[in-house]
Every structure is written in C-alpha cells, then in structure tokens.
C-alpha cells in the first residue's frame, strides 16, 4: 500500500536528491490513530541510508553555504508559499497520521509557515564583527558561519512544525540538513518538509530524510562523524541520551534539546475567573494535551479556588471530543497504544494517591475524553510529571507565595502562565517562576517566530526562533590578520 504527497511516493526517503526505498529489513506500518486503518507500508531506513544521507549533505553543504544570501532567502520564502499552496493536502495528512484535529492541523501549518518566512530573512542577518587587537598591525575578524551539517530528530505531536522549526533556519544560514522523523509520523515529520524544500529549489543533497526505528538507526544518527549539531525535540529521557551520545559517542558535537514540560497555569486572587477558566480548558486539552507546553497543573489561589473549579469543570464538560476530521473537534485520539496505556496508568494512580475526580470521560479506543482531578498535591505523580494527554490537575494555593512555590515544584521549566488583573503584579510573579517562558493572561501554549523559545531545568538546552535560531545554527570563527 502506498500514499503520495505533492506528486511523490510518500513511502520513500529523500537521500542525495533521489526518492528511494529504505534498505532496512524492517517494514513500517503507518496507522491512523483514530480508526486504526493502515495509511501505508514502507521499508525503513538502515544505517547505510543514514551514511548516504549524511555524506550527500556533507558534499552539498559548502556550495549551498556559498549561494548568495538573496538566492537562499528566495528559496526559503518559496517553501513558505508552498506550505500554503499545499495546505489542504497537509491538513489531511496531519489528521490521518498524527491524530490532529482539523483546527490543530491548520494551526500547525500556519506556525510552520511563519517560522519559514522568518527564516527567509536570516541569510541577510548573519553578522560577524571586527575587533581591535592588542598587537600593533593586527586585525581580528570574527566570522559567523554555518555549522555545516545538522541532524534533526523531530517528534510526533507537531511533526511538521517541529521539523521545520529546525530545518528552515538551519538551511537559511547555510547548513545542510538530514531529518529523522518520529516513527509514528514519517510523512508529516519527514517526507512533507523534505518535499516542500526540494520543490522550493533546495539543491540535491542539502536536505534528506531517513525514517527508521530508533533501535536500528537512532544512535548512529547522533554519533555519526558528519553532523556538527543535533537538534532534538522530544522527551527528556531520550533527550538526555541524545546529549550523552553527542558528547561521548564519537566526534563531539553541539546539541539543541527541546524537551518535556509540566506547565503551571496560575490563577491569582484578582484574576478574571471566567476568562481564566475558558483559557485553561483550551490550553490543557488542545491536541489532546500532547504538547510540551500544554497546561499540566492549574494552581489557584484559595480565595477563588471553588469558583474557578466550578467554571473550569463546566468548560471542560463542553469540549467537543471525537473524530479529528470533524469541524469543531478539540480533542481527538492519542497517538498510539503505548501512550494510551500510560494515560490509563496515570488515571488510576491519581485516584489511588487521593486526587478527587471532577471530570472522567470515557475511553473509547485511543480516544481519551478529558479528565480533571482536584485536591491534588505537588507530591502526586500527576502533578510532578509531564502527562502528555487529556488529564489535568487542580492544586489549591494558600496565597500568592505558596502559588509560586507550587509552580516551581517541578523538574521542568518550559512554559507557564499567570492570570491577574494587575499586570505589574503578574509580571513580578512571572519573574519568580523558573521557566523559560511565562505568559500573562494567556495560554501556556504560545509561539512567535521572532521571539525566543526554550526552557530551563529539565526542559532542555538551546533556543529557537529569530536571532536566537541564527545563533543556534551558526558558529563563530576567528580569523586573525597580522599586516605588519
């Protein structure tokens, strides 16, 4: 069984400018997580395929980096246009391969287009500097140049956007790229980004994609001698492994790690309770809660706790859940049976540890209806760990200081939100939260292509978007010139 995207066989891998079958003995079966139908079957990539992709990238990179900035900009901008031109086809792929709802799929394409347009400006924004020397007659030039070849490992939750978030800036500043998409989303995370940039005019070899089992090619993809940077988005345990391999598994290379989250959504005593309750319902359950920035914990000042909980529960009970292809659905299926099993265990453990069930929807196949737990304490697993599903906990804070303490009671620090009618008060509170990103009177799920994105603690290393992406995907080189 085969499937296509933009006129090419979507079961193939783009390696060195050619769409080819993988050379692994393993066959990948691409499953629709909602109805369990088989989308396609394909031969996975092998270690030899990884070698071929990296060697093609190494061979093509220097010429690509030497391509005039205006030409690179035009190609990257054309990729953004192609994302829009192929929007409907991509939406259908995101729905059937990743379980995205129609609204989430459209949002994802918009986000991918935005970072691609932003990246189109990067070739003209890469600047070096000339520094004075303490030696007479000497000049110090610091050039900012492309890393070389970048390996991109992308996840299954926002596969298109979280591939392109690394691919577009990396290409724009002169790198070549090899993508290893998640096994659940080889098309939306690998084939589609590769095809879009190929169609836009990126030369052969500058972008490749190899979809294969992590157990077969994962370590080799990271430890290979060619890439100078591995950009990984995924879970914290796997991210730790990637970091260790990048340092200890072969020639040392840098890493950009965007990992897990456990986002707190803090409702202070003077918050707009109606607005906060509605926002929390969306921020917790968008894409089934399978977003690193999803609200995991709602922390509410005791003075407004009961009022908020009542309105939040009411909002959650009205969330449309079901077929992701239907207009208006907010919660669709979780990605696979492993995720489903983990969520079932978390639900039972929350009950066992003493949480009160406020909302407990049914579980139908991989469709997990929203669950809300109250009377949660910070030592319970549902509050400590990233959930990555449609489960949310509500914690009561004694006061503002206690709310800050609860917000920081996590090993993660990716995104957070605080709600208050007093903006200055909220801003001061935000500075107390050890998180890479904090949003006031807004969702924890936020991304703008020109604004820094990244976390603290166990949520990762490195920064994406705008000037921060330029720095991430380039390196400095000092050329000292002694004239006399």
UniProtKB/Swiss-Prot annotation:
Substitution effect: residue 199 to A: Less than 50% of the activity of the wild-type with vanillin as substrate in the presence of NAD(+). 78% of the activity of the wild-type with vanillin as substrate in the presence of NADP(+)
Gene3D superfamilies documented for this protein: Aldehyde Dehydrogenase, Chain A, domain 1, Aldehyde Dehydrogenase, Chain A, domain 2
pH effect on activity, per entry: Optimum pH is 7.0 for the NAD(+)-dependent oxidation of vanillin.
Disruption phenotype: Significantly decreased growth on vanillin, 3-hydroxybenzaldehyde, 4-hydroxybenzaldehyde, 3,4-dihydroxybenzaldehyde, ferulic acid and caffeic acid as the sole carbon and energy source.
Assembly behavior: Exists as a homodimer, homotrimer and homotetramer.
Family note: Belongs to the aldehyde dehydrogenase family.
Chain's role: Catalyzes oxidation of vanillin to vanillate. Also oxidizes 3,4-dihydroxybenzaldehyde and 4-hydroxybenzaldehyde significantly. Other aromatic aldehyde substrates in the order of decreasing activity include 3-hydroxybenzaldehyde, 4-nitrobenzaldehyde, terephthalaldehyde, 2,4-dichlorobenzaldehyde, benzaldehyde and 3-phenylpropanal. Low activity with phthalaldehyde, cinnamaldehyde and syringaldehyde. No activity with phenylacetaldehyde, formaldehyde or aldehyde. Active with both NAD(+) and NADP(+). Involved in the degradation pathway of lignin-derived aromatic compounds of plant cell walls.
The name this protein goes by in its record: Vanillin dehydrogenase
Source organism of this protein record: Corynebacterium glutamicum (strain ATCC 13032 / DSM 20300 / JCM 1318 / BCRC 11384 / CCUG 27702 / LMG 3730 / NBRC 12168 / NCIMB 10025 / NRRL B-2784 / 534)
């Amino acid at each position: 069984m085969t499937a296509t995207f933009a006129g090419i066989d979507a079961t193939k891998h783009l390696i060195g400018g050619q769409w080819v079958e993988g050379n692994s003995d393993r066959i990948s079966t691409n499953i629709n997580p909602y109805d369990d139908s088989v989308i396609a079957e394909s031969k996975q990539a092998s270690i030899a395929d990884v070698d071929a992709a990296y060697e093609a990238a190494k061979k093509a990179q220097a010429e690509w980096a030497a391509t005039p900035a205006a030409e690179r900009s035009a190609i990257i901008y054309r990729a953004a246009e192609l994302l829009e031109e192929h929007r409907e086809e991509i939406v259908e792929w995101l729905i059937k391969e990743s379980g995205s709802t129609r609204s989430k799929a459209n949002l994802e394409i918009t986000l991918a287009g935005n970072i691609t347009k932003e990246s189109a400006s990067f070739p003209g924004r890469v600047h070096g500097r000339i520094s004075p020397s303490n030696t007479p007659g000497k000049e110090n030039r610091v050039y900012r140049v492309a890393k070389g070849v970048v390996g991109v490992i992308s996840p299954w939750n926002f596969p298109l956007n979280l591939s392109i978030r690394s691919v577009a800036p990396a290409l724009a500043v002169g790198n070549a790229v090899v993508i290893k998409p998640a096994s659940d989303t080889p098309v939306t995370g690998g084939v589609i980004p590769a095809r879009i940039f190929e169609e836009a005019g990126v030369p052969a070899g500058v972008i490749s994609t190899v979809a294969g089992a992590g157990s077969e090619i994962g370590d080799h993809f990271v430890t290979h001698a060619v890439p100078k940077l591995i950009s990984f988005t995924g879970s914290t345990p796997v991210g730790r492994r990637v970091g260790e391999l990048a340092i200890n598994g072969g020639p040392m290379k840098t890493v950009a790690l965007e990992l897990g989250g456990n986002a707190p959504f803090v409702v202070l005593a003077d918050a707009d309770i109606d607005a906060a309750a509605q926002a929390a319902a969306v921020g917790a359950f968008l894409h089934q809660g399978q977003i690193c920035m999803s609200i995991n914990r709602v922390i509410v000042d005791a003075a407004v706790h009961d009022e908020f909980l009542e309105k939040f529960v009411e909002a959650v009970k009205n969330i449309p859940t079901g077929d992701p292809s239907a207009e208006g659905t907010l919660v669709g299926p979780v990605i696979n049976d492993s995720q489903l099993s983990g969520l079932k265990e978390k639900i039972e453990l929350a009950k066992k540890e003493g949480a009160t069930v406020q909302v407990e929807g049914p579980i139908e196949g991989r469709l997990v209806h929203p669950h809300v737990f109250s009377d949660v304490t910070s030592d319970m697993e549902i509050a400590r760990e990233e959930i990555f599903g449609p489960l949310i906990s509500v914690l009561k804070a004694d006061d503002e200081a206690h709310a800050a303490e609860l917000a920081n009671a996590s090993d993660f620090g990716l995104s957070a939100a605080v709600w208050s009618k007093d903006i200055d008060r909220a801003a001061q509170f935000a500075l107390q939260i050890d998180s890479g990103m904090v949003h006031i009177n807004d969702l924890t799920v936020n991304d703008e292509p020109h604004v820094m994105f990244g976390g603290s603690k166990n949520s990762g290393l490195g920064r994406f978007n705008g000037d921060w992406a330029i720095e991430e995907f380039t390196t400095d080189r000092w050329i000292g010139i002694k004239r006399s």
